[in-house]
C-alpha cells in the first residue's frame, strides 16, 4: 500500500511534518513536491529505498542521485566549496538548480556520481520542502519522479499517485508543481559549466 496525504505547502501542520519524517526514519520512500516537479526522497543511508527508486524509474544501477538540502550550510557539510562556488550558490538558491561538486568523505556512496567522487546538491525553493528538512534535520537523497515511459508526463497529482501506488510508502500531495528539470551546473572546474538547461536561468555566466 501507499499512503497519500494532502498538505497545504504554505501551512503544513507540525503533526503532518512529523508523520512524513517518521516514514523516512523508519526506512520509507516518499514522493514530495519541489520547485521543479515531484521528486522521490529517502534518507542517505537507506540502500533499500535507493534500489526501489532504481526499479520504479527503470534506471541503471550506476545512476547518480542528488542531495536535497535546506541551506548552504547543509551543502557545505557534503561538498568541498571554493569561495566562488559559495558566492554563486548563495546567489542562485533557493531555486531550481542542481550543482555538481567534489564530495566530502562523509557523503554516502549511494549518492556519488562517479569515481571522481562528485555529488549533486540542490536547495529547492519550495516552502514545504524547507519545512520538512527543518524537522528532519538532515538532507534527503532525491530523484526526480520521472516514470520509465517518457510520454508519461503526469501533472495531476491523483493520476501521479495512481502510477506510483504500491511502489512508495507516502505520497505528499501539495498540489500542482511545475514539471521542468533543474538547471544542472558543474562546479568542479575552473569555470561553471551548464550540463543541462532547465528551469533555472543561466544569465550568471
Where do the PLM segments sit?
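Active-site-adjacent structural elements in enzyme catalytic cores
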Residues: 1-205
Amino acid at each position: 500500500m501507499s499512503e497519500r496525504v494532502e498538505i497545504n505547502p504554505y501551512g503544513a501542520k507540525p503533526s503532518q511534518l512529523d508523520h512524513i519524517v517518521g516514514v523516512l526514519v523508519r526506512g520509507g520512500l516518499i514522493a514530495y513536491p519541489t520547485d521543479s516537479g515531484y521528486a522521490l526522497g529517502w534518507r542517505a543511508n537507506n540502500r533499500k529505498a535507493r534500489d526501489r527508486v532504481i526499479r520504479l524509474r527503470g534506471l541503471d544501477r550506476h545512476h547518480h542521485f542528488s542531495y536535497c538540502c535546506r541551506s548552504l550550510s547543509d551543502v557545505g557539510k557534503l561538498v568541498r566549496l571554493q569561495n566562488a562556488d559559495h558566492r554563486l550558490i548563495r546567489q542562485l538558491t533557493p531555486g531550481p538548480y542542481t550543482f555538481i561538486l567534489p564530495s566530502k568523505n562523509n557523503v554516502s556512496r549511494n549518492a556519488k556520481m562517479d569515481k571522481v567522487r562528485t555529488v549533486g546538491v540542490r536547495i529547492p525553493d519550495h516552502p514545504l520542502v524547507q519545512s520538512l528538512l527543518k524537522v528532519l534535520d538532515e538532507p534527503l537523497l532525491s530523484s526526480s519522479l520521472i516514470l520509465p515511459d517518457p510520454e508519461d508526463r503526469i501533472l495531476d497529482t491523483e493520476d501521479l499517485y495512481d502510477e506510483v501506488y504500491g511502489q512508495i510508502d507516502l505520497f505528499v500531495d501539495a498540489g500542482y508543481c511545475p514539471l521542468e528539470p533543474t538547471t544542472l551546473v558543474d562546479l568542479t572546474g575552473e569555470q561553471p559549466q551548464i550540463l543541462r538547461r532547465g528551469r533555472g536561468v543561466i544569465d550568471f555566466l
